[in-house]
Amino acid sequence: KRSKQYRKRILEISRKVSAIHLGGSFSCTEIMEVIFNYFLKSKKEKECFVMSKGHSSIIQYIILEEKNILKKKQVEMYCKKGGILGVHPDRGNPGINASTGSLGHGLGMVAGLALAEKRNRNTIYSVLSDGELQEGSTWEAIMLIPALKLNNVVVVVDNNNLQSFEKTSVSHPGLYPIEKKFRE
């Protein structure tokens, strides 16, 4: 039910600006709903989420609005002159733990945050895109996390098989099955 409301809100905002990545935002709506409403339940200062697929930031903003971390007016000003919220998350804004945008950089930041927070037993959650798995820096972070025994990282890959020019499975068939890559 919440996911449906989130999608309606995304569409409502998309009528006013052209900078929304609808496909990527819609495909991770349920993922974001579960992370923010079942795992990040409290407002603990050290609870941490990184939207590695930064182009889908609008869903994060809408959830932060629902949680009264962002104001409705701030979300209404998404990608508008005078607004604080852009297409990609900026850690200078309330509820945003890392500035992301260029695919492939988010998981490295997650590894750094996890290392810093391991002693405090704080978990770092992140959503990656399947297209982002084409980036070498993502795989460096994927290998670094277990090497440093960072058991306080939860990564969810939005495996929607979509990217800018063609299906992810067509451009990089070696990625599939993705689940197997995380077990090797």
Language model feature labels by segment:
Residues 3-19, 158:
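N-terminal capping segment at the start of a domain
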Residues 5, 23, 27:
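N-terminal glycine-rich anion-binding loops that anchor highly charged ligand groups
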Residues 12-22, 91-97:
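Active-site flanking loop/helix segments enriched in acidic
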Residues 26-147:
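Cofactor-binding active-site loop characterized by glycine-rich and histidine/acidic residues
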Residues 50-52, 152-159:
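Short internal beta-strands
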Residues 122, 170-184:
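Conserved thiamine diphosphate
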Residues 134, 161-164:
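Short gly/pro/ser/thr-enriched loop/turn and capping motifs at secondary-structure boundaries
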Residues 165-169:
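Short, surface-exposed acidic-centric catalytic microdomains
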